[in-house]
Structures are given as structure tokens and as C-alpha cells.
């Protein structure tokens, strides 16, 4: 007969088993989340003898559950008794690595690699390497595909030269596997494997593998082999060896019949350039770069556009001006808007390298062209990078060249473009000075307060405070405050609301005199507005004014003028108005 303690010991595993077999997937997922708690309750021995075998046998479930299990098992070494017993986790993970769903297999591979790090040499050779070999020679491609991700961990952990030779040979078979679904992960992992072998082994064994994969009949394999070339270039280091082994494959990549392969080269061009060194860049990489900029496929041109700043950093200024800038000028009028948008985001970064004179001569005209682009994303990208150019050429020159276009964009039909311009205004204002700003941009800033998009009105209000801090209180009192206060009588309540929001935003930059003479009369009028939203926002504005008046040492204005108005609002018919008015009064009493 079982004792009470024995029953209690069995209870957690019984509950877990019940929940793992539950019809509802949420119960099964919850059970897996508590797996470590159950393992702690069982102790290492029972976890090894009961829990792990049970999990191993129950691998026949929905992908979400299997993925969670694969993830959990990677962190289970301590629960089975530490590294000495880590190998007991390999069996369920091997089964998970053979499943059909890629997400599950990837999680299983990650967990197997975690466990591998904990294994002793004996465990590695007795359990892990045979597991890798079994998966590599399995009938189903899913197992072979998973095995590709295990070789780096096994190889780096092994200290046995014979085992290492065996692993390299087995990996070579994966790179020549009949299924492209296996060759793809083999190519991905080959780029990592290269760093684990000697330089001579890389030349003798991995360059032939690279040549095979880079000439694969499947473009999905070829494009993944580009990273192998980058890795090999880093391992070889020598200019002569890189020229001998990798130059022809690079030319083949750039002229590959598949645009997806060329895209991969374009998107990672700087990564390759940084590892081959200045001599090869100058002699061998400029022409491929230009060819990709002129590629027939727009996605390739877009990808190479993102590489322009990074690649040009590695070139002499003269080469940039002679070889790269003319092609950029062609791309400014590219028929694909995504290419132009990528240019807009990236060409500004050339300004520091080109310097003031050449930026003015070459980049500013291109900026102006892109600021007039029909696509809003292109315009937006250029605006977002104006500050980089400003640091090189100065705001005066920038504003002279681009101000007309900026003013036009301030009224752009796309609100995100208008918003980007608003964000840029304080920088312009600071550099241009008050007279120039009032003449060219003052009315523009006020017009945004009446924009039909709330985000624009909100940004415009925040701008008013920044401008007040730049130009001073006197300027604000004479120029902007009368204009936004005049909106208190606007027939549309949204614009009356803008007046209140502007008061709340700008108040900390004002003094008690301005508040008493200009702000309070407006709020007194709006206290009786027919719209409840207006009235309760007036109450919130009063709350903002208190610390400003207190800082000025004038509490009588608040006590004699504002408190009576708040008390009036506490008796309002609308409960929201009552609430915010009461809250403002309570703040007053603190």
C-alpha cells in the first residue's frame, strides 16, 4: 500500500501527464511552461527516469506544443542532474529535429547545440556525434536539413582529430545532398564552419564545397553561398589567394541569371568589401558595384542603394566623384519609387566624405530633385536626413538651396511629409534667425494649427513652445500667441480645442503677466463653451497654469480669478467636466 508521501510525489507527474494529454492546446502549453517546476519537484533522478522518457514518447502533437517543448529542453541540463547526465536530453530533441515543421526543427537544433556545449568528450563521441551522423543519413530530408545546424557545435567541442575529419566528410555529403532543402541549410552553416577549420583545410575542402554550392542549379542555394565567399575571404586574408579563389565566383554572382542571387550580393556588398581590403576594392569591386547599380531588376538596385554610404567610405573621394556619383545621378530618376526612396535615405551620408564644396555641387541638386519627387516616401526620406547635410554645408546654404522645396512640402497632401517638415522647423529657425523665419515660415507654422490631421496640429503646438524658447517671450507675445488665441472663436470645436492645447503646451515658457493679460481672458470665454470636451480641457489647462503663476510669486491671480472658474466647472452638468475641475481644485489645495 502506497504511503501518503509516495502519493504526493506521484501527483505532479500525474497532473502533468493529464494536462499534456488534454484536448485543449492551451492546457498542453501551460503544462510545458511548468515543466521546470515539475522537474524540480520530481528531482533529477525521476526527471531522467520518468519525465524525459514520457516526453520522448509523447512527441506526436501540434507544432506549437512541440516548438515549446523543444525550446524548454535546451535549458533542462540542470534539471536532469547537470552536465554528467545532459546526454539523456538528446533522444527527445533528436525526434523533434526530425519533425516536418521548420520552426520546431530550428528550436530543436538550437537546444541540441546548447546541450552539446555541456557534454564531455566521452559524451560527445558516444552520444552527440552518432546523433549528428544518424540525422545526416536519415531517409527524410527534414532530418538531414536539421543535421546541418549541428556540425559547428560538434566540431568546435571535439578535441579528437579523427572525429573532426569524420564530421567534415559528413558535412561535405550534405553540401552535395540531392534535396535543395538540405543544401540550403548546409550552405548557411558552411559559412560558419569555415571559421572552425585551418586555412589549409578551408582551401582544400571548403573552397570546392563553395564552388559546388555557388554553381548550384537552384538559385535559393546559390544566393546562400555568397556568405561562404565572405567567410572564405576573411579566412584567406591574402590578396593573391582571394584573387585566385574568389574573384571569378564574385563575377559570376554579379552576373547571375537569378535576380535573387544578385540581390543577395547587393544587400551584403559592404560586408564583402570590408574583408577583402583596399587593394582589391580599388581593383576589383568598383566595377561589380556599378553593374549592380545599373541592374535590370529594381530590387537589386534598391539593395545596392543601401550600400552606397558604406562602400563609398572605403573609396577615395576622387573615385566616388568619378565612378559612383554619375550613376547615383542616373538613379535619381529611376522608374522604381523604392529605388529612389532608398537613395533618399542613404545619399545624405556621403556629405561628410565629399565635404562642403562637392556636397553643394553634387548632392544638393540631387536632394532638391528628390524633394520634388512624386512619391511621399522619397520626400520623407530626404527630409529625415537633412540634418546630416546641414552639418557639412551649413543651414544658410542648405536653406537657400532647399527652402522653396521645404515650404512646398509643408503643404504636402501626405500628412507624414508635413509632420517631418514640422519636426525640422526648430533647427531651421535656430539657424535662420527671427527676421528670416518670420518672413518665410511664420505663417506656415500657424497654418499647421488648423490642419485637418490631429497629429499635425499636435506637432505644431509642440513646435510653438520650442520656437518660444528659441526666439524669446517677447517674440511669442507679439507673433504667435495672438494668432492661436484668435482661434478661440473658431466655429469648429476642434480648433477651439487647439487653442487650449497650445496654452497648456506653451504656458511653462510664459510669465505671470502674459498669462493674466492674454491667456486668462481666453480661458474665461471657453469656460462657457457649449462643448463639454472644451470645458474639461479648460479645467486641465488651469491645472497647468498654477505652477507657472506660483513661480512668478503671484498666487492672487490664481486664487481670485481661476479658482472661482474651477468652482463653477465643478457644478457643470457634464460628469467629465466635474471630474477634471474637481481634480484641478484638489491640486490647488496640495
Curated annotation (Swiss-Prot):
It comes from the Eukaryota. SUPFAM superfamilies: ARM repeat. Keywords: Repeat. Gene3D superfamilies: Leucine-rich Repeat Variant (1.25.10.10). PROSITE patterns: HEAT_REPEAT. InterPro entries: ARM-like, ARM-type_fold, HEAT, HEAT_type_2, PP2A/SF3B1-like_HEAT, PP2A_Regulatory_Subunit_A. GO terms for biological process: asymmetric protein localization to old mitotic spindle pole body; establishment or maintenance of cytoskeleton polarity; meiotic centromeric cohesion protection in anaphase I; meiotic sister chromatid cohesion, centromeric; negative regulation of septation initiation signaling; spindle assembly. The keyword DNA-binding does not apply. Signal peptide: none annotated. The keyword Signal does not apply. Each HEAT repeat appears to consist of two alpha helices joined by a hydrophilic region, the intrarepeat loop. The repeat units may be arranged laterally to form a rod-like structure. Phosphatase 2A affects a variety of biological processes in the cell such as transcription, cell cycle progression and cellular morphogenesis, and provides an initial identification of critical substrates for this phosphatase. The regulatory subunit may direct the catalytic subunit to distinct, albeit overlapping, subsets of substrates. This is Protein phosphatase PP2A regulatory subunit A. It comes from Schizosaccharomyces pombe (strain 972 / ATCC 24843) (Fission yeast). The lineage of its organism: Eukaryota, Fungi, Dikarya, Ascomycota, Taphrinomycotina.
Amino acid at each position: 500500500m502506497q504511503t501518503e508521501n509516495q502519493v504526493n510525489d506521484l501527483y505532479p507527474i500525474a497532473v502533468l501527464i493529464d494536462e499534456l494529454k488534454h484536448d485543449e492546446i492551451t492546457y498542453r502549453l501551460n503544462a510545458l511552461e511548468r515543466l521546470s517546476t515539475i522537474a524540480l519537484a520530481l528531482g533529477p533522478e525521476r526527471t531522467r527516469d520518468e519525465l524525459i522518457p514520457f516526453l520522448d514518447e509523447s512527441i506526436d502533437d501540434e507544432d506549437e506544443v512541440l516548438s515549446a517543448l523543444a525550446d524548454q529542453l535546451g535549458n533542462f541540463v540542470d534539471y536532469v542532474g547537470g552536465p554528467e547526465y545532459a546526454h539523456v536530453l538528446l533522444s527527445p530533441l533528436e525526434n523533434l529535429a526530425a519533425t516536418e515543421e521548420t520552426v520546431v526543427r530550428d528550436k530543436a537544433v538550437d537546444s541540441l547545440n546548447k546541450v552539446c556545449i555541456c557534454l564531455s568528450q566521452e559524451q560527445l563521441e558516444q552520444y552527440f556525434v552518432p546523433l549528428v551522423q544518424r540525422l545526416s543519413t536519415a531517409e527524410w530530408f527534414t532530418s538531414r536539413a536539421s543535421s546541418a545546424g549541428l556540425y559547428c557545435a560538434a566540431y568546435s567541442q571535439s578535441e579528437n582529430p579523427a572525429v573532426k575529419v569524420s564530421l567534415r566528410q559528413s558535412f561535405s555529403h550534405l553540401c552535395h545532398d540531392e534535396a535543395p532543402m538540405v543544401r540550403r541549410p548546409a550552405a548557411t552553416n558552411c559559412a560558419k564552419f569555415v571559421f572552425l577549420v585551418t586555412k589549409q583545410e578551408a582551401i582544400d575542402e571548403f573552397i570546392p564545397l563553395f564552388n559546388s554550392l555557388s554553381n548550384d542549379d537552384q538559385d535559393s542555394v546559390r544566393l546562400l553561398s555568397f556568405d561562404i565567399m565572405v567567410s572564405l575571404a576573411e579566412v584567406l586574408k591574402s590578396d593573391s589567394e582571394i584573387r585566385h579563389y574568389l574573384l571569378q565566383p564574385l563575377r559570376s554572382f554579379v552576373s547571375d541569371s537569378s535576380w535573387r542571387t544578385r540581390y543577395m550580393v547587393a544587400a551584403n556588398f559592404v560586408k564583402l568589401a570590408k574583408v577583402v581590403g583596399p587593394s582589391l576594392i580599388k581593383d576589383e569591386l568598383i566595377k561589380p558595384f556599378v553593374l549592380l547599380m545599373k541592374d535590370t531588376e529594381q530590387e537589386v538596385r534598391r539593395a545596392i542603394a543601401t550600400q552606397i554610404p558604406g562602400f563609398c567610405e572605403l573609396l577615395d573621394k576622387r573615385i566616388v566623384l568619378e565612378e559612383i556619383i554619375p550613376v547615383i545621378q542616373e538613379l535619381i530618376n529611376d522608374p522604381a519609387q523604392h529605388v529612389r526612396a532608398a537613395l533618399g535615405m542613404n545619399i545624405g551620408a556621403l556629405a561628410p566624405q565629399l565635404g562642403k564644396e562637392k556636397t553643394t555641387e553634387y548632392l544638393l541638386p540631387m536632394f532638391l530633385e528628390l524633394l520634388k519627387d512624386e512619391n511621399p516616401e522619397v520626400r520623407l526620406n530626404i527630409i529625415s536626413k537633412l540634418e546630416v547635410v546641414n552639418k557639412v554645408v551649413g543651414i544658410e546654404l542648405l536653406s537657400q538651396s532647399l527652402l522653396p522645396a521645404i515650404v512646398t512640402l509643408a503643404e504636402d497632401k501626405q500628412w507624414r511629409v508635413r509632420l517631418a517638415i514640422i519636426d525640422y522647423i526648430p533647427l531651421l529657425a535656430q539657424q535662420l534667425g527671427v527676421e528670416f523665419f518670420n518672413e518665410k515660415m511664420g505663417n506656415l507654422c500657424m497654418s499647421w494649427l488648423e490642419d485637418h490631421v490631429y497629429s499635425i496640429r499636435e506637432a505644431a503646438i509642440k513646435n510653438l513652445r520650442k520656437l518660444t524658447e528659441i526666439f524669446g517671450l517677447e517674440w511669442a507675445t507679439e507673433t504667435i500667441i495672438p494668432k492661436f488665441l484668435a482661434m478661440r472663436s473658431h466655429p469648429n470645436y476642434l480648433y477651439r480645442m487647439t487653442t487650449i492645447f497650445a496654452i497648456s503646451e506653451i504656458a511653462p515658457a510664459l510669465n505671470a503677466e502674459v498669462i493674466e493679460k492674454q491667456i486668462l481672458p481666453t480661458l474665461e470665454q471657453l469656460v462657457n463653451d457649449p462643448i463639454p470636451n472644451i470645458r474639461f480641457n479648460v479645467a486641465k489647462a488651469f491645472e497647468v497654469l498654477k505652477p507657472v503663476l506660483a513661480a512668478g510669486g503671484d498666487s492672487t491671480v490664481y486664487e481670485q480669478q481661476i479658482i472661482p472658474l474651477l468652482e463653477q466647472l465643478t457644478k457643470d452638468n457634464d460628469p467629465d467636466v466635474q471630474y477634471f475641475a474637481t481634480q484641478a481644485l484638489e491640486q490647488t489645495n496640495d
